[in-house]
């Protein structure tokens, strides 16, 4: 093994897929690229595939991997690429696809099939219908590959990924527990569970990762807990994979384990951040892992853990990162600057809320400013100063109007201005409650619940629980 491979400091476990290359270094870099792609760290995945290409320019699968890593994924479909980013990305992908096709004749039959399939993943134009068409074409192409090589775990994972991306974050109807109309969730469940019966499947990060994403929205998320437990320590330095089991831990109420997994994930993320910095899209996943740690700690009543994680997150979220225009980092990340407000509200730290300063840059920190108004409004109401709470309520409504529709909430894929409408109704309920108008208060909280229920599945604050708590306080009163 060469010097470059020996110096690579990330522990990615032992997963290996043999590809057609006589160069041992190229094989090592290919394996790393594939694992990182399963871990949704697409930039590091692409970097590894480029290293593999440098070691063996004739390896078709390394070009395939580069094209795959740079394309759309479950959390970032084509329509969320900004124009500049999309143009540059498509140029790189098209070159990789050409090289993959040129070198495919020297590859195995399965590798040739994968190279052929990924050609369909590039849109013919730059409109939404073009994106939809290429996603469908790629899923159809991968279905053909799966029909020929259904016992191959990588083929199964890639096929599952292609189909799930047709209905990303919309796989199940949360009210009925049934698949959403037009989704192929039961089909994916069937072939992933068939794969889970194979030997060595618990060593495959892609299968385990996708099965968690598939089942977390279902009415039976607990069935994926075994897969989650195998994934927990499988790829120690891939923060997102270390974090993923916590999606299920939260749903089944295992907050202790959710805290532990997210704490480990944050350490892995910080290891990568210390070497490469934060000027990359993986910063979104890094913030999500911090957010999930904070979220679990809030549910567990651990204010110290939550506040320490908030401070770590804030330190790694400088204005310079938010100011990057392509991709538009503020749209993806600025909302995380507002998380401290949620923690202080959760633990009733009213004076700290009232002391929170507003950022100077009202455009860059538009979500944070709105959230601070929300938090101060709750604090004033809780302390009995309804007049000041009403002023904050008015300021909140004006602040929400300033938030562009492109700003994503931490509860991806929801938009911040939509999520804050839940906060508006909650604050209205809190104020009415403090005014002694309980019927009006509960109507506002019920409205907050309706707005919350209308959000796309994510990991949101439980408005129903807050409503129940308010009813309990009324009974006590």
Give, region by region, the residue ranges found by the protein language model.
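Solenoid-repeat scaffolds in large eukaryotic assemblies
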Residues: 45, 93, 156, 188, ...
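Flexible glycine/proline-rich, aromatic-decorated loop/lid segments
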Residues: 256-273
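Active-site-adjacent "gating/activation" loops or surface patches in catalytic cores
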Residues: 205
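Soluble catalytic regions of membrane-associated enzymes that act on cell-envelope
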Residues: 202
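Short coil/linker segments at helix-helix boundaries
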Residues: 2-58, 63-151, 158-198, 208-218, ...
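TPR-repeat structural position
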Residues: 42-43, 135, 185, 220-221, ...
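Helix-coil-helix junctions within alpha-helical repeat/solenoid scaffolds
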Residues: 301-328, 334-477
